[in-house]
């Protein structure tokens, strides 16, 4: 019986394993094994549920609801009732500018204001900055082609929009540097709108009008039919819920933890076709007819080195940034801040180590044991300040408390803190990323049964990883059952 080995037990690998299991349940005569080198499943999704009732997210705390793969997966798993929406009654996000929290104006889509009055009245931008942003209506479009996000925003909307809006959004949410980000790989819609409308503001307004026209009478524009959804959503017990549900649905004897692959060689299988010999760190070997690499690109590069040095080289060209999160639980009686909002983001030029702060207990239900507490989640590190992700625990906590005191006036000691570190965990889609993907696909296609999946390639979000893992597994199953498919990324 032919076998597929899935390397990596994060959301990508578990989604791949589930897709293979469904293929087997549908009659495919194949086998599989998932190999996770750490003691736990979930990868960057890591929820700590404490005995006294806190739900603490170490990794991502939510997902974007506009991508359907997570809802499709939950429907198959029978866990649709576990989704929760954000508390949009207090839907305010702030940007820290000159040591003051300034509300992000209503109507901002991606990085573009689309509503006139909120844009005119906001104190986030100066009047010269607003006038420069309005010039987007008149600036000619450039020739088609990729450029960095910073170059694009600076050219179309001006430096102040870059510094006060685009920069904190991509640094606080994606841990990225707009000066190196490939626009074609991250926000291709912005390039498309410039070419189609000659202005991204015109393009965003046109898109908003189209959603208004398409929405059923009385419905919120863009809202899907069925249960309520907000732009950002999570799960009742934290994002770990989706990991737990995938494991619950898996064949437990085929999901292995503490199972690290030391190296892989390409060999001939018993049937004469290409196979892969996986050398495990415990000295054992596993022979598989197909391999789904559901690990970060730099890990995959190490494993394919013996097979394809050129492929390994290109995989290593995808940078990975490091970050850290610290969650702090405070007794409400000890603090005066009202926490009316989702949190704030910090531009690079403000000189803070904190990149973003989520007011978790306000944004999400069920994150604190009772209303006697408030919980804050802070992100540090990222592409331009990775050293901050490795500060010693006591120094990291000291820095965060000092900066929260400066921004929010909190001088009380937290009742509890939780620190999580993520070294080389956030792939960076730098300029030339799409060209690298073409090279990766070309080199991987030369090796039948090799499939690459995960956040390093075509989307870093949880729905992107689910889609990537599922697609790779379905292609692997089709390949092993005789419906040959080229290796894809």
Predicted regions and their residues:
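Beta1/beta-strand and adjacent pyrophosphate-binding region of the FAD-binding site
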Residues: 1-12
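Conserved FAD/dinucleotide-binding core of flavoprotein oxidoreductases
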Residues: 139, 146, 151, 209-240, ...
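Conserved Rossmann-like nucleotide-cofactor binding loop
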Residues: 12, 40, 298
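Conserved flavin/dinucleotide-binding core of flavoenzymes
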Residues: 105-107, 339-341, 356-489
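Active-site/ligand-binding neighborhood in enzyme catalytic cores
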Residues: 92, 129-273
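Glycine-rich FAD pyrophosphate-binding loop
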Residues: 21-51
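Dinucleotide-binding Rossmann-like beta1-alpha1 core, especially the glycine-rich loop
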Residues: 51-140
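Mid-domain catalytic core of redox enzymes
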Residues: 257-376, 383-389, 402, 406-407
């Amino acid at each position: 019986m032919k076998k597929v080995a899935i390397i990596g037990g994060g959301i990508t690998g578990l989604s791949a394993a589930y897709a293979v299991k469904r293929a087997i349940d549908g009659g495919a005569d194949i086998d599989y094994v998932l190999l996770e080198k750490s003691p736990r499943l979930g990868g960057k999704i890591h929820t700590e549920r404490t005995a006294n009732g806190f739900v603490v997210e170490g990794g991502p705390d939510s997902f974007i609801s506009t991508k359907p793969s997570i809802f499709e997966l939950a429907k198959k798993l029978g866990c649709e009732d576990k989704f929760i929406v954000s508390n949009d009654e207090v839907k305010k996000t702030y940007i820290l500018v000159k040591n003051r929290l300034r509300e992000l104006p209503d109507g901002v889509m991606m990085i573009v204001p689309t509503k006139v009055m909120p844009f005119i009245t906001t104190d986030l931008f100066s009047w010269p900055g607003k006038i420069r942003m309005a010039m987007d209506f008149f600036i000619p479009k450039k020739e088609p082609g990729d450029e960095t996000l910073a170059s694009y925003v600076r050219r179309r909307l001006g430096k102040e929009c870059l510094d006060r809006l685009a920069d904190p959004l991509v640094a606080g949410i994606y841990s990225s540097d707009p000066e190196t980000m490939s626009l074609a790989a991250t926000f291709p819609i912005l390039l498309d709108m410039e070419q189609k409308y000659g202005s991204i503001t015109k393009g965003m307004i046109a898109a908003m009008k189209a959603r208004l026209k398409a929405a059923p009478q009385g419905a919120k524009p863009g809202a899907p039919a069925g249960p309520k959804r907000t732009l950002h959503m999570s799960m009742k017990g934290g994002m770990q819920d989706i990991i737990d549900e995938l494991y619950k649905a898996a064949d437990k004897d085929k999901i292995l933890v503490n199972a690290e692959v030391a190296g892989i060689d390409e060999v001939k299988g018993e049937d004469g076709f290409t196979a892969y010999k996986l050398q495990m760190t415990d000295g054992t070997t596993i022979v598989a007819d197909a391999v789904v690499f559901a690990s970060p690109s730099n890990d995959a590069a190490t494993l394919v080195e013996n097979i394809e040095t050129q492929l390994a080289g290109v995989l290593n060209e995808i940078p990975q940034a490091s970050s850290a999160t610290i969650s702090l639980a405070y007794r409400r009686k000890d603090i005066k801040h009202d926490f009316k909002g989702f949190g704030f983001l910090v531009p690079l030029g403000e000189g803070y180590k904190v990149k973003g702060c989520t007011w978790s207990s306000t944004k999400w239900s069920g994150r604190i044991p009772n209303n006697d507490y408030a919980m804050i989640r802070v992100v540090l590190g990222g592409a331009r300040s990775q050293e901050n992700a490795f500060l010693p625990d006591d120094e990291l906590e000291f820095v965060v408390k000092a900066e929260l005191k400066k921004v929010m006036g909190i001088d009380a000691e937290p009742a509890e803190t939780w620190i999580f570190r993520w070294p080389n965990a956030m792939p960076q889609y730098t300029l030339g990323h799409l060209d690298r993907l073409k090279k990766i696909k070309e080199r991987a296609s030369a090796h039948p049964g090799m499939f690459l999946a995960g956040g390093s390639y075509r989307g870093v979000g949880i729905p992107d990883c689910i889609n990537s893992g599922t697609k790779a597994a379905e292609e692997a199953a089709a390949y092993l059952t005789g419906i040959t498919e080229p290796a894809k990324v």
